[in-house]
Amino acid sequence: MGSLGAILKHPDDFYPLLKLKIAARHAEKQIPSEPHWAFCYSMLHKVSRSFGLVIQQLGPQLRDAVCIFYLVLRALDTVEDDTSISTEVKVPIVMAFHCHIYDNDWHFSCGTKEYKVLMDEFHHVSNAFLDLGSSYKEAIEDITMRMGAGMAKFICKEVETIDDYDEYCHYVAGLVGLGLSKLFHASGAEDLATDSLSNSMGLFLQKTNIIRDYLEDINEIPKSRMFWPRQIWSKYVDKLEDLKYEENSAKAVQCLNDMVTDALVHAEDCLKYMSDLRGPAIFRFCAIPQIMAIGTLALCFNNTQVFRGVVKMRRGLTAKVIDQTKTMSDVYGAFFDFSCLLKSKVDNNDPNATKTLSRLEAIQKTCKESGTLSKRFCVFDFPLETIFYRV
């Protein structure tokens, strides 16, 4: 639950936080008895509690498939992220990862904390994967193969251009969107979404994470992880790491705003994808992370704290998003409000101000044209600014 100080400052957070805590305890009690499934669901809650909560609302077969899909890709991502592994060792592993998921004797020790446990005990994930229906297995294998090939390409290549950036994000996140769309379709609950819309769902989340995690990635030991494209950052500094130095704050914020503006191009596709969903559980599963993403972009925009430490939405607001996101009108409301906040933070002297405002106005137009913005809105306070969110 949130800290006492945060709750006293935002007393209306208390009830959503309490509901979230109760839901988390309930989810932990739902862990299956079979050892391999027990490992998978307990690991899911350790690597992503919020994801673990939302996934519990899916139907049993789809829930199992999405759980394993997530853990397989987290394991693959753990190999890619471990900067202590040499390229010569790493590339063959990620290239063959789609084969390893069929081998319940395979494991590879890497990563730290819960991710090391995931890798050391990967046979549990393999056993659970083998329990899935054939259509689910085929979708997971296909996406894992394509993602591994893409990761291998960028292990040996830096992100130079915006096209490189989009391609990298496609491999590590856009393909997740494609895979989830395949799993939703295989379950019989949804029509198969277009690759373009599915890709945008992944890119919006991934670009938000890359922006938010700048400092963590640049300070990675033994080697920095650099995902911001040179085509953007080279307009402001000579080296990507220069953005974290206080003397470069003005240029760093301009670069940050450029990155946020680039991410916003995917928002309208995300709204279209979500508006096409039929199942309430699948809808919430998709919508909650997207609202968190645009909220995080609103918090990061024009904020030097991105280059000084951790920037994230407060836990109470996260609890409200999870509790109150029920329908597409809630999504339109949240996207509209967060785009209003973003718009209020645009400095007309920023070199990308015109482009940023244009993208925000396009998002607002889509939300207004939905015809669902008639409700009033509550105001929530961030440590750094005021955030609006739908009641």
Swiss-Prot record:
Organism: Panax ginseng (Korean ginseng)
Pfam families recorded: SQS_PSY (PF00494)
Catalyses which reaction(s): 2 (2E,6E)-farnesyl diphosphate + NADH + H(+) = squalene + 2 diphosphate + NAD(+); 2 (2E,6E)-farnesyl diphosphate + NADPH + H(+) = squalene + 2 diphosphate + NADP(+)
Induction comment from the UniProt entry of this chain: Induced methyl jasmonate (MeJA) in adventitious roots. Induced by A.niger mycelium-derived elicitor, thus improving ginsenosides production in adventitious roots culture.
Protein name: Squalene synthase 8
Major localization listed first in the record, in broad terms: endoplasmic reticulum
Pathway(s) annotated for this protein in UniProt: Terpene metabolism; lanosterol biosynthesis; lanosterol from farnesyl diphosphate: step 1/3
Subcellular location: Endoplasmic reticulum
GO molecular function: squalene synthase [NAD(P)H] activity
One term under GO cellular component: endoplasmic reticulum membrane
Name of the top EC class for this enzyme: transferase
Family recorded in the similarity comment: Belongs to the phytoene/squalene synthase family.
Keyword Ion transport annotated: no
EC code: 2.5.1.21
